[in-house]
Structures are given as structure tokens and as C-alpha cells.
Design a protein with these regions (language model features):
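Alpha/beta-hydrolase active-site loop
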Residues: 49, 54-119
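Short beta-strand element of the alpha/beta-hydrolase
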Residues: 11-20, 33
Length: 200
């Protein structure tokens, strides 16, 4: 983007993007491009162990749900598809926000974005589980002022979080009913999932 069109001498609102379960940071490129074309800065990350693949600082791949066998899936869902995983994912967004405010990313690299971002206007957007991550981010972080969930997945929210009004603008774009409420699977495997299914 740098060099194509001179950046105006102004600050732009920031949107943090959270991908879905097993997704990637670039999975919603068309929506991100549209937002950037309309004056937003969008930053995305891969959620380690919950993206289809990420890489550590030495370039080694970190696959999705590392070391979780098919036999362990049900227990994995009970433990991680509740509040814990969504909170880990929110911590990734909080880290992004903290990092983008720094003057430099390391001793050799100046942060070219810090001075063009309006940190008083930060929002979050996510797809599926990223929508739940966005909602938790709005509850926990005063800097996140608004959110959008694209077919949001909210089954991982604890009752207290699911019933809390953020008092912030939040748009959920998705179907009225995610699944048949009588099915077995992720919803019933989650301690809070069955109850929160009825809320959303």
C-alpha cells in the first residue's frame, strides 16, 4: 500500500480481525480490502494452535490443535471450546493492540503505523469463533469500542459473559439459528454451550 497512494496526514480508525476456528489471518481478505479502501487500518493475526497453521519465531510450523488426537476431541471441546480458548484468543488481540502502539517492533524496525492510527477509535471484527473473540474483547477491553461478528460462534461464552451488555455497538451478521438445538456435538460437549445456544 505504501507508495501506491500517498497516505493522508491524518489518523485512521483501527480494526482488529480474528479468524474462525481453524482459519487464517487472511481468510476474509475481501472484507478487509473493502474496509481499508474506506479508510480503516485492519490488523489480523493467526491464533496459535487454533489457526490452520502458524509458525514459531524460528520458522517451525505449529499445526492446528497440536497433539490432540481424534480420541481426545470430546475432552478437548469440553475444556477449550468453553471460555478458556476464547479468552486466549482475546489475549492475541490485546497483544496486537499493545504492539501496534510501540515506536518500533524490534531494534532494527521502526513502526510505520503508529502515527497513522487513531487509537481512540478501535473496533474488532471476527468470523465464527472470531466473532465470540470479538465479543469477549469488547467486554474486557475499554479500548475496543465496537464489534462485528460474521456468523459469530458464541457457545464458548460463560453465562455471565453471554448475558452481559457491553453497552457498545455490536453487529452480528448470521443466521437466526446456528444448528438444531436438540443435536449432540460441540454444543452439548461444552459446559456452557447448551445454555448459551438458547441466548443467541
Amino acid at each position: 500500500v505504501f507508495g501506491l497512494v500517498p497516505i493522508q496526514d491524518k489518523k485512521f480508525p483501527l480494526i482488529l480481525f480474528s479468524h474462525g476456528d481453524g482459519g487464517l489471518l487472511n481468510q476474509n481478505t475481501s472484507q478487509v480490502e473493502e474496509l481499508v479502501s474506506n479508510g480503516y487500518v485492519v490488523i489480523a493475526c493467526n491464533h496459535t494452535y487454533n489457526a490452520s497453521i502458524t509458525f514459531d519465531k524460528d520458522g517451525r510450523p505449529i499445526p492446528y490443535k497440536q497433539n490432540v488426537s481424534w480420541n481426545e476431541q470430546a475432552q478437548y471441546h469440553k475444556k477449550y471450546y468453553t471460555n478458556l480458548l476464547i479468552n486466549y484468543r482475546y489475549q492475541d488481540l490485546a497483544f496486537l493492540l499493545k504492539t501496534i502502539k510501540k515506536d518500533s517492533f524490534n531494534e532494527k524496525s521502526v513502526n510505520p503505523f503508529k502515527n497513522i492510527i487513531d487509537f481512540d477509535n478501535v473496533g474488532a471484527m471476527g468470523h465464527s469463533m472470531g466473532g465470540g473473540t470479538t465479543y469477549i474483547g469488547m467486554l474486557k477491553d475499554n479500548e475496543i469500542k465496537a464489534g462485528v461478528a460474521l456468523d459469530g460462534w458464541f457457545f464458548g461464552l460463560l453465562d455471565k459473559d453471554a448475558k452481559t451488555n457491553t453497552k457498545k455497538p455490536f453487529l452480528h451478521i448470521g443466521q437466526e439459528q446456528f444448528l438444531d438445538s436438540n443435536i449432540d456435538g460441540d454444543i452439548n460437549d461444552s459446559n456452557d454451550g447448551k445454555r448459551n445456544f438458547d441466548i443467541y
